Amino acid sequence: MAVNLVTGVTAKHGTVVDFGAGPGLFLHALGEARPDVTLLGYDAYMEPTYPEVKYVASMEGIAAGSVDVLTAFEVCEHLYADELDALLDDALRILRPNGALVISVPIMCGLAIVPKVSNWMIRSRSLKSEYTPTEVLKAMVGMRVSRPENPRTTHKGFDFRQLREVVEGRFSIDATHMSPMPNMPWWLSSQYFMICRPKRNSASNSAVCA
């Protein structure tokens, strides 16, 4: 789904930057689907493993108004509030006026919480979970669960609806998609995608935001 969504919003010979690119698997797959696209990755912790993918040392090194699509797949749930603000500021600065910010995050409420918590317990070979039984029930019915102070290694308590509210402060959300149940209510899926466009006033004021 990520490759299809980005392919659909990327202009011919466009530039795509993947924030939190890891070893570059997504950009590699995108390059196979769209050989015309320039691929740039940024990751504070990992090096690229695919020779066709170039990494930038920092987001500040990307020229203003030079990017067609900025992606942030499965990373926003691990950012502190100030880091998320910095990412959105960078997006407004580097995106072209008609560019797109494409985000995906896990859905940690609704029915998906049960298999996700169960899977975590199986993988860790433990009967203990970050979630108490009460918190699992709260998450199942869409109630918010408190987040740990450190979001780096956990999804607990992440609420995509709160992220959407923050993003909507600076971007217009053109489209949303759910996986693996795209035509069903969000509480039946486990992943949430947003295609976001800079608001006109935000784009013009990006220098102030940065």
Predicted feature descriptions by range:
Residues G22-E60:
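Class I SAM-dependent methyltransferase SAM/SAH-binding core
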Residues H13, V67-D68:
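Local beta-strand N-terminus motif with an aromatic residue
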Residues E74-H78:
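Short catalytic micro-motifs in class I SAM-dependent methyltransferases
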Residues T71:
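A conserved beta-strand element that flanks and buttresses the S-adenosyl-L-methionine
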Residues T15, T38, A100:
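Residues at the starts of beta-strands that form the adenosine-phosphate
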Residues M1-H13:
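Conserved alpha-helix/loop element of class I SAM-dependent methyltransferases that forms part
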Residues H13-G22:
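Conserved class I S-adenosyl-L-methionine
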Residues L25, A29, E60, Y80-R96, ...:
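S-adenosyl-L-methionine-dependent methyltransferase catalytic module, highlighting the catalytic core
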